[in-house]
Amino acid sequence: MSDTLVLRAATPADAATIAATIAAAFAQYRGKLVPESGAFGETAEAIAAELSRGAGAIVAERNGEMVGCVMIQEREGDLYFGRLAVLPAARGTGLARRLIDAVEADARRRGLSGIRLGVRVVLTDNQRLFRSLGYREISREAHPGFDYPTSINMRKSLV
């Protein structure tokens, strides 16, 4: 059997599988992020509602099974992405980069000027990946109840 990877736009019917993929991918961060990641509260219903309201997602399927996904939404003239999730068994294959490439291609098709994301201050490996792909820090912010930065906002210009 050949190993086939397909990246495609998600539909609301994908919501349960997206929620499960996010939960499995983010499990490594449980108890390590302060405050806890909102990804742990994602539900199929919430994701379906987001998709129905105009947010989007790109899913990666290998041989028909979802192995990764990323949520997207237009914000302030840019395309924002979050919940970049790759299943543990699919890590180290370049899939995160492929998903980000797909986000960037979508933003270009939409005629948007850039891509934005947020990453936790403590996730230095993730920051390193984003920087290697041309993303630059634009600001830091604290989650509610914190008096120090917990998140870094990054942006990549497409113009």
Predicted features, each with a name:
Residues 6-20:
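A short beta-loop-alpha structural element at the N-terminal edge
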Residues 20-48:
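Conserved GNAT-fold acetyl-CoA-binding loop/helix
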Residues 100, 107-119:
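Conserved GNAT acetyl-CoA-binding A-motif
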Residues 116-120, 131, 136-153:
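Conserved catalytic-core motifs of GNAT/GCN5-like acyltransferases
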Residues 48-59, 80:
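A short helix-loop-beta-strand connector motif used in the catalytic cores of GNAT acetyltransferases and
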Residues 86, 92-105, 132:
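Conserved acetyl-CoA-binding loop-helix of GNAT-fold acetyltransferases
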